[in-house]
Swiss-Prot record:
Its cofactor is heme b. Binds 2 heme b groups non-covalently. The cytochrome bc1 complex contains 11 subunits: 3 respiratory subunits (MT-CYB, CYC1 and UQCRFS1), 2 core proteins (UQCRC1 and UQCRC2) and 6 low-molecular weight proteins (UQCRH/QCR6, UQCRB/QCR7, UQCRQ/QCR8, UQCR10/QCR9, UQCR11/QCR10 and a cleavage product of UQCRFS1). This cytochrome bc1 complex then forms a dimer. A ubiquinone binds at H201. The gene is MT-CYB. Keywords: Electron transport, Heme, Iron, Membrane, Metal-binding, Mitochondrion, Mitochondrion inner membrane, Respiratory chain, Transmembrane, Transmembrane helix, Transport, Ubiquinone. GO terms for cellular component: mitochondrial inner membrane; respiratory chain complex III. It comes from the Eukaryota. It is found in: Mitochondrion inner membrane. InterPro entries: Cyt_b/b6_C, Cyt_b/b6_C_sf, Cyt_b/b6_N, Cytb/b6-like_sf, Cytochrome_b, Cytochrome_b_C_euk/bac, Cytochrome_b_N_euk/bac, Di-haem_cyt_TM. This is Cytochrome b. It comes from Lama glama. Belongs to the cytochrome b family.
Length: 379
């Protein structure tokens, strides 16, 4: 008799995705982050649901409703901080996941890669709208500045911004619709993640060597389920350390001041995970140019499969490309630092150099390195 997990219509899907799935025998801990992202998403949806039970999306009561959650709701403080810091953990896992894909050439799976880019944009949009909801100073001014960027679009820009605002400034209508979108988008993300996984399982996972591992596959369970549980425990431990010992470490003190349209904070900046893109935006002294650079800083990922010039898929045996990859990582960390600094010398120049280097590395230096490494192979 066939095992029920292989015959039952629902269990069969779970079995083929998480139990009997053939996986390469040599995938390292860098492959843990997909499952960690799934855990982050489930955790964010659960904590978000409980927060939504007590939150009110009205400009007069939003700030006090968040204070009420922290003070009066049973364990409201931990739910709120798990949700806020859970977003940070989500982005750490997300950036490592993308970095892994870049390093090991996982972008050769085109459908999986492109759905991943759509997922990245959706998660960024969700996080941005979530940051607006507590209705503190940085929430309000962040929403004002970022939505205003759309006014740089020729002809339709101003109309588009007012349409998003639901009025002539960021106000009650904006907050209500941002709450609605912030609630629905995680479910869109979950659906997209399902499609992401569907396309991945069409080809099977990549591995550190970038060579086909069809002749050496092992079942996902128990090998990688155990490995994923270890990763999950480390993720939860890190998150709990953050939430219980320093919940406001990654937040902005300005967001503990209620939103005031008449008082602009001295430094408007987004959460830390958007600072690299914000630094690229600010490094161009033209509004439309800055907005284009901001969008392209993420959209450039879609070009990476086209820019792959090497005969080898992975960077595992390509030292020049490895150096450039880690230079890119250092450059992104530099941009993150610059994004949090005021717009004054020497930070302006550092930001401009780092932005140029970011695009140069991806568009020029890495493809050239691939060609050079191909020639080295002939020696």
């Amino acid at each position: 008799m066939t095992n029920i997990r292989k015959s039952h219509p629902l269990l069969k899907i779970v079995n083929n995705a998480f139990i009997d799935l053939p996986a390469p025998s040599n995938i390292s801990s860098w492959w843990n982050f997909g499952s960690l992202l799934g855990i982050c998403l489930i955790m964010q949806i659960m904590t978000g649901l409980f927060l939504a039970m007590h939150y009110t999306s009205d400009t007069t009561t939003a700030f006090s409703s968040v204070a009420h959650i922290c003070r009066d709701v049973n364990y409201g403080w931990i739910i709120r901080y798990l949700h806020a810091n859970g977003a940070s953990m989500f982005f750490i896992c997300l950036y490592i996941h993308v970095g892994r894909g870049l390093y090991y050439g996982s972008y050769a799976f085109l459908e999986t890669w492109n759905i991943g880019i759509i997922l990245l944009f959706t998660v960024m949009a969700t996080a941005f709208m979530g940051y607006v909801l507590p209705w503190g100073q940085m929430s309000f001014w962040g929403a004002t500045v970022i939505t205003n960027l759309l006014s740089a679009i020729p002809y339709v820009g101003t109309t588009l911004v007012e349409w998003i605002w639901g009025g002539f400034s960021v106000d009650k209508a904006t907050l209500t619709r941002f709450f609605a979108f912030h609630f629905i988008l995680p479910f869109v993300i979950a659906a997209l993640a399902g499609v992401h996984l569907l396309f991945l399982h069409e080809t099977g996972s990549n591995n550190p060597t970038g060579i086909s591992s069809d002749m050496d596959k092992i079942p996902f369970h128990p090998y990688y389920t155990i490995k994923d549980i270890l990763g999950a425990l480390l993720l939860i431990l890190t998150l709990l350390l953050l939430v219980l010992f320093s919940p406001d470490l990654l937040g902005d003190p300005d967001n503990y001041t209620p939103a005031n349209p008449l008082n602009t904070p001295p430094h408007i900046k987004p959460e830390w995970y958007f600072l690299f893109a914000y630094a690229i935006l600010r490094s161009i002294p033209n509004k439309l140019g800055g907005v284009l650079a901001l969008v392209l800083s993420i959209l450039i990922l879609a070009l990476i499969p086209l820019l792959h010039t090497s005969k080898q898929r992975s960077m595992m045996f390509r030292p020049i490309s490895q150096c450039l990859f880690w230079t890119l990582v250092a450059d992104l960390l530099t941009l993150t630092w610059i994004g949090g600094q005021p717009v004054e010398p020497p930070f302006i120049m550092i930001g401009q150099v780092a932005s140029i280097l970011y695009f140069s590395l991806i568009l020029i230096l890495m493809p050239v390195a691939g060609i050079i490494e191909n020639h080295i192979l002939k020696w």
